[in-house]
Amino acid sequence: MLTWTLFGLSSGDPGLMKEITAEIRTVMGNKSRPDYDDLVQMKKTRCALIEALRLYPEPPVLIRRARMEDTLPVGGSGISGGIKVLRGTDIFISTWNLHRAPEYWENPEKYDPTRWERPFKNPGIKGWEGYDPNKMSEFNLYPNEITSDYAFLPFGAGKRKCIGDQFAMLEATVTLVCT
């Protein structure tokens, strides 16, 4: 996450790097180490990390096994009735493709941390709620699957979601701030 964040910041808009540096200096003042409240205030810094997770998710594929026969909805694909899945079928979810899908993301190949500061929605996808930064809980350091209506799954979702997701964001933010 850190490598891709630094890559995105160094190869993108130079003004963005200046904004993030200014944010860190403003929040940190004369402190040498941030506390949790400092990190919560550093929204632009966290958005830079979040955008790197969108473009370069780790892992790029989530694997689940159907515990019973079911029919999966197919969203905006135009296929009616869904896809029948038999019990025991392995289901591969490509977060790499999901996070770069033009149906969900404007300019999906572009590293743009500012996309996380504004709501977005595609009215062409029936039933998709889109993303609204105002829905983020004060306890979340990144937009989770609920906030993005399952269009952003860098740590998975549901009961099988990475248990260390918030710690990973916390640790990455501290490392970026102290670098």
Task: List where the protein language model places each region.
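Cytochrome P450 heme-iron axial ligand motif
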Residues: 137, 141-179
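Cytochrome P450 I-helix active-site segment
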Residues: 8-59, 66-67, 81, 86-89, ...
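Hydrophobic, repeat-rich solenoid/adaptor surfaces of innate immune receptors and signaling proteins
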Residues: 2-6, 95, 172
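Active-site proximal loops enriched in glycine and acidic residues that flank catalytic Cys/His/Asp
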Residues: 64-65, 95-96, 115, 156-157
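Active-site catalytic microenvironments for nucleophilic, acid-base chemistry
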Residues: 5-12, 175-179
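Conserved cytochrome P450 K-helix/beta-meander segment immediately N-terminal to the heme-binding cysteine loop
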Residues: 93-142
